[in-house]
Amino acid sequence: MSGTLVRMAGPTVVAEGLAGASLNEVVRVGEERLLGEIIRIEGDRATIQVYEETAGLALGEPVEASGEPLAVELGPGLLGSVFDGVQRPLSELAAREGDFLGRGASLPALDRARAWEFEPAVAPGDRVEGGVRLGVARAPGAPDHPVVVPPGVAGRVAEVRAGARRVEEPAVLLEGGATLALLERWPVRRPRPARRRLPPDVPFLTGQRVLDCFFPVSAGGTAVVPGGFGTGKTVLEQSLAKWAAADVVVYVGCGERGNEMSEVLDEFPRLEDPRTGGPLLARTVMIVNTSNMPVAAREASIYTGAAIAEYFRDMGRSVALMIDSTSRWAEALREISARLEEMPGEEGYPTYLASRLARFYERAGRVETLGGAEGAVTMVGAVSPPGGDLSEPVTQCSLRATGALWALSADLAHRRHYPAVDWSVSFTLEGDRLAGWFEREAGDGFGALRDEARKLLQRERELAEVAELVGTESLQDAERLVLESARLLREGFLRQSALDPADATCPPAKAFEMLRLFLEWHRRAGAAIGAGVPLRSILDTGLGARLLRLGQLPAAEVPAAAAALRADLSEALARMEAE
């Protein structure tokens, strides 16, 4: 089916003669065959958002409908690849066309020439259905790639073709003539089905103490990371990609500055994967749509990332989907809505912003797959509120749709406190659900310690306001101890060094032992002050400095170091009380 262009407004164009087209159908626009998607139909007129620069298009140029929705190619070769928002392979296109892509440039997302060794797990006569593993695809220098039956496909195996196969070549033939290849296509806006959702009672461990202990999120949960410029959103997401409990990382750079994304593309291949010792990029899929790339493709990029994440989830893997940032996605939505002349909502964003965000975050979850395995997609969405204003619409809509807020503070970032998570603003809705896991796996009493630590930090904030008025020296020793204990907790527990091999990540058991010792120091020092020991004498023991160095020890050495420090504390306090 084909039509003709009758109206153009930036990336939004209108074509006549497409009466039989459907919503979200992919079209090719103009003589250069620019990629687009139908977003509105009125009679035989279709409104199309074009995923490329539209300058130079002329009225009357042809528009060709494909009959299919916008879809991604899923199969071996995804890991380690870099795509744009509509899954064009940027590395291959750059090699062919240079650093700047021409309009209409296109290549298949997966290499059609590369051969993979297919080792089947099924035999003729077996009945297969969606989610069943057909076998494994292997290639030199690439991780093993499970091949599963796509959702909605079922039948009895008639023939298996093992050995070297390209992604489009049939690997399994079903009775009735249907074929299954290593490659499948899936519409990006349609969530992939699962057998059932599992309860959110297992944490998504990040390796960051402030997140795992104070504001945990479940595997398959959602978190939003708002923060102004320079607060460390990108650095935090890179640390999560490296250290979080995820088998696969899908990183979506949505509308960020080109310089920032080029830095990410330069650093990721050089980051070492702590699991394998190889490059972190080997278990990462990157989707890049910078601020100077077409705005419509930016809107599609997060759906492309979600479809790829769900594909790996269906293999029984834990997937972390990082989006940097949803604010740029919402700005693209606002621009498209304005060109459609829709009624604007708050700050010009479309009135359906909240429902679109909620629908997207609902694609996260820990599930039992169609094949009976357990997989999860955990979403972490960065937000870039103008001026750090958390009351703006994108942040507020994200808060209503997600389970945790990891708010970043510019003040903490300027003080070189990493991660710059503001513990007075951040929260989680999943702490109670995950409390049982932490009590079992980290240590009995973990929840009580966390509550005690947060009360200590809140008390410090109250006393700090008083100290600004009257001076620290005017406070009683017990109040000054609160300030000192909270400082030790902030600098020794909540702050982590991404450059220290032992402190870059922290397992829950190590965090529990550290937190217990910090709070024990505070309680016992408070008891000594109550018995008449001056605070200065306690501080002169140097035990506080030893507390600050606990995080730099490997996890296996922390219990012994904590026991030694606890014994030295008992001896010092006993001596001072006797004096």
Swiss-Prot record:
GO terms for cellular component: proton-transporting ATP synthase complex. Its EC number is 7.1.2.2. ATP binds at G227, G228, F229, G230, T231, G232, K233, T234. It comes from the Bacteria. GO terms for molecular function: ATP binding; proton-transporting ATP synthase activity, rotational mechanism; proton-transporting ATPase activity, rotational mechanism. NCBIfam families: PRK04192.1 (NF003220). It catalyses: ATP + H2O + 4 H(+)(in) = ADP + phosphate + 5 H(+)(out). GO terms for biological process: proton motive force-driven plasma membrane ATP synthesis. It holds the Pfam family ATP-synt_ab_Xtn. Produces ATP from ADP in the presence of a proton gradient across the membrane. The V-type alpha chain is a catalytic subunit. InterPro entries: ATP-synt_VA_C, ATP-synth_a_Xtn, ATP_synth_asu-like_sf, ATPase_F1/V1/A1_a/bsu_N, ATPase_F1/V1/A1_a/bsu_N_sf, ATPase_F1/V1/A1_a/bsu_nucl-bd, ATPase_F1/V1_b/a_C, P-loop_NTPase. This is V-type ATP synthase alpha chain. Keywords: ATP synthesis, ATP-binding, Hydrogen ion transport, Ion transport, Nucleotide-binding, Translocase, Transport. Belongs to the ATPase alpha/beta chains family.
